């Protein structure tokens, strides 16, 4: 009987030891905090070491540094809070399915430099275990946030009018598109900026570039977005405007009418259709 008890106790101890050995020393919450703190302090090498293997295939250390530079140019983090850990048995990230993923919601209190107001930002983070350590699945949220912050920075740059700023915005948007080449809103912003080059010597081809960008914006437009119709209306209106620049008025009218089809309350295509009508008369 004592032998059986001893064996049972030994097995229990072995299980406890194995569980202790197999469990990551740092929790997902601790890794999340370390990532935020290292990014804020500029220790990108350590921050990068916290990414999952798959995330590192899509994101470089230079990308992290560039992300942070854009972030601090558009927002100031006042404080942040990390929510409770939640286990997700199956989670799909960047086309790949992961098991037993830890989800965390991070809440940031920020000062938005573009809109000059305090705001709250919520970000979901997902962690997987690699070599007995929690690693951050970053690519999906990274590319989305990179695009949003890049467009904010572009808007800040455009507070000043001039070729110098248009060229800076062009570079900002091209880098963001390289990170997220299927973001409809980035292509829309790029098309808008290309139109700013009109009239400057040596940039006569930019309106053609704008047409290419607006077509890509249409191609990658998310039909599941709650603002799909509004976004579609704005894109079709801009395409109509670009075609007006090229004096392709019949085509322009078609796209401006499409813009109204998606949003009959959009005043811009109404104005542009009226402009064409006056021009043709």
What are these regions (language model features)?
Residues 169, 207-210, 252:
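Single-residue signature of alpha-solenoid repeat helices
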Residues 186, 227-228, 235, 269:
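TPR alpha-solenoid repeat register
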Residues 45-101, 106-108:
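Short solvent-exposed beta->alpha transition segments
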Residues 174-182, 216-232:
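Flexible helix-coil transition and linker loops at the boundaries of alpha-helical arrays
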């Amino acid at each position: 009987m004592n032998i059986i008890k001893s064996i049972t106790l030994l097995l229990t101890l072995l299980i406890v030891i194995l569980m202790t050995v197999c469990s990551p020393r740092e929790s997902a919450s601790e890794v999340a905090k370390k990532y935020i703190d290292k990014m804020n302090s500029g220790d990108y090498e350590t921050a990068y070491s916290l990414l999952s293997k798959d995330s590192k295939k899509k994101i470089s250390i230079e990308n992290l540094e560039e992300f942070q530079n854009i972030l601090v140019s558009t927002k100031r983090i006042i404080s942040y809070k990390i929510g409770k850990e939640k286990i997700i048995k199956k989670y799909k990230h960047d086309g790949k399915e992961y098991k037993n993923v830890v989800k965390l919601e991070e809440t940031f209190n920020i000062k938005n430099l573009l809109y000059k107001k305090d705001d709250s930002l919520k970000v979901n983070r997902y962690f997987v275990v690699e070599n007995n350590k929690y690693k951050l699945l970053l690519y999906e949220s990274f590319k989305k946030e990179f695009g949003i912050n890049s467009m904010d920075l572009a808007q800040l740059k455009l507070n000043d009018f001039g070729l110098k700023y248009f060229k800076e915005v062009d570079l900002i948007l091209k880098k963001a598109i390289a990170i997220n080449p299927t973001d409809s809103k980035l292509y829309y912003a790029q098309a808008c900026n290309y139109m700013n080059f009109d009239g400057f010597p040596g940039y006569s081809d930019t309106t053609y570039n704008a047409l290419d960008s607006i077509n890509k914006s249409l191609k990658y437009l998310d039909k599941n977005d709650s603002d799909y119709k509004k976004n579609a209306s704005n894109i079709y209106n801009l395409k109509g405007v670009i075609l007006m620049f090229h004096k392709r008025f019949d085509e322009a009218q078609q796209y401006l009418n499409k813009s109204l089809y998606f949003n009959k309350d959009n005043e811009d295509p109404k104005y542009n259709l009226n402009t064409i009508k006056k021009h043709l008369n």
